Design a protein with these regions (language model features):
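Positively charged, solvent-exposed patches that mediate nucleic-acid binding
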Residues: 1, 24, 37, 46-47, ...
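A short, N-terminal amphipathic alpha-helix
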Residues: 81-88
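Residue-level signal for inorganic ion chemistry
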Residues: 22, 79, 99
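Short acidic/glycine-enriched loop/turn segments that link adjacent beta-strands
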Residues: 36-39, 107
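Acidic-basic catalytic patches of nuclease active cores, encompassing PD-(D/E)XK
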Residues: 1-32, 87
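Domain-level recognition of nuclease-like catalytic cores that cleave nucleotide substrates
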Residues: 89-116
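Conserved catalytic cores of phosphodiester-cleaving nucleases, focusing on short active-site segments
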Residues: 41-67, 71, 79
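Hydrophobic "anchor" residues on beta-strands that sit immediately upstream
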Residues: 28, 51, 96
Length: 116
């Protein structure tokens, strides 16, 4: 399981903006676009013993709903499973895992910590 550069140009720009937000707030970017055959985690960040699994949603308009609305219950379940696989593979010494959603829209980044 290796990171890869997938997704659209807009999605990559959103991931760059979200990464910058986490760096500005004292996090280390551990991995971007970590993937396995069952899916991908956009961002994995660390601050101390806290590991953050972040889903990044980028929108240019609200025409199809807010970025936060795009993270469905099915997507949340899939991210939990992916996080488990990541933890089993990497065996980090993390005591706490948190799931965030980063919404990137109109040049701004809003992070919902502990989104689920």
């Amino acid at each position: 399981m290796v990171p890869h550069a997938g997704g659209s140009a807009l999605g990559r720009l959103g991931e760059e903006a979200a990464s910058a937000w986490y760096l500005q707030h004292g996090y280390e970017i551990v991995q971007r676009n970590w993937s396995c055959r069952t899916g991908e985690i956009d961002l994995i960040c660390r601050r101390g013993q806290l590991l953050v699994i972040c889903e990044v949603k980028t929108r240019t308009t609200d025409q199809f709903g807010s970025p936060f609305e795009a993270v469905t219950s099915a997507k949340r379940r899939r991210l939990r499973r992916l996080a488990t696989l990541y933890l089993l593979e990497t065996a980090p010494t993390t005591t706490v895992v948190r799931f965030d959603v980063a919404a990137v829209q109109g040049g701004s980044v809003e992070v919902l910590e502990n989104a689920f």
